[in-house]
Each structure stands twice: as C-alpha cells, then as structure tokens.
Swiss-Prot record:
GO terms for biological process: translation. Forms part of the ribosomal stalk which helps the ribosome interact with GTP-bound translation factors. Is thus essential for accurate translation. It holds the Pfam family Ribosomal_L12. Keywords: Ribonucleoprotein, Ribosomal protein. Gene3D superfamilies: 3.30.1390.10, Single helix bin (1.20.5.710). The keyword Ribonucleoprotein applies. GO terms for molecular function: mRNA binding; structural constituent of ribosome. GO terms for cellular component: cytosolic large ribosomal subunit. The keyword Ribosomal protein applies. CDD domains: Ribosomal_L7_L12. This is Large ribosomal subunit protein bL12. Belongs to the bacterial ribosomal protein bL12 family. Homodimer. Part of the ribosomal stalk of the 50S ribosomal subunit. Forms a multimeric L10(L12)X complex, where L10 forms an elongated spine to which 2 to 4 L12 dimers bind in a sequential fashion. Binds GTP-bound translation factors.
C-alpha cells in the first residue's frame, strides 16, 4: 500500500514537535541528506544588477581651450554666455542630468572635442 502526500502530511501533523524532530533526524540518516537551507551566494546578488538607463554628464575640467568648452556647454544646455561661463569656471559641474546613454555619450564627445575632461555618472 502506497501513502499519498496528503496522508503523510496528515500523519506528521498529528505528531508532537519532538516526534517530528526525531523523524527528520531519521530521514537525514536514512537518505544521507540534511534539512539545512542552502545560503545564496554572491552570484545571486550579481544577477539582480540592472543596466543604468539615465546618466549625468559631469564637466570635470575645462582644459586649456576654455572658450571652446563654453561654446559647447552653451550648445548642449541652451544657457546664456554668462551662465555657461559660470558653469565651466565652477567645474566640476553637472552639464546634463538624467539623460539617455546615447545623449550622454554625444554630449561627452562634444565636450571632449572642445577640450574638456568629462565623466558620465
């Protein structure tokens, strides 16, 4: 006669906690297994990492061609001459915030061509 899962669960449910502990120990010895829960390793945490979708373009340093960098900042941001100069003089400054990867790379390329040192964050 074969027992169903429901019958086994019902039988275990009628036992005391001590009897269940003894049953678990007997099953571990009989089948050569342990009832310990395996801990998740660092590989599981690494799988959750998502690709960044929004970037900030940070002007780290204007470099030697400051006038060209000011022009590039004006073109990218739409700022006036005074505001663009203040942003360049105050480096490091965020030039573009929350932009797509493509837009951030384009802005970085334009600023670097103008002579600036730029980072994407």
């Amino acid at each position: 006669m074969s027992l169903t899962n429901e019958q086994i669960i019902e039988a275990i449910g009628q036992k005391t906690v001590l009897e269940v502990v003894e049953l678990i120990k007997a099953m571990e010895e009989t089948f050569g297994v342990t009832a310990a829960v395996a801990a998740a390793g660092p590989a599981a945490a690494a799988a959750v990492v998502e690709e960044q979708t929004e970037f900030n373009v940070v002007l780290v340093e204007a470099g030697e061609k400051k006038v060209n960098v000011i022009k590039a900042v004006r073109e990218l941001t739409g700022l006036g001459l005074k505001e663009a100069k203040e942003k360049v003089d105050g480096a490091p400054q965020v030039v573009a915030e929350g932009v797509s990867k493509e837009a951030a790379e384009d802005a970085k390329k334009k600023l670097e061509e103008a002579g600036a040192k730029v980072e994407l964050k």
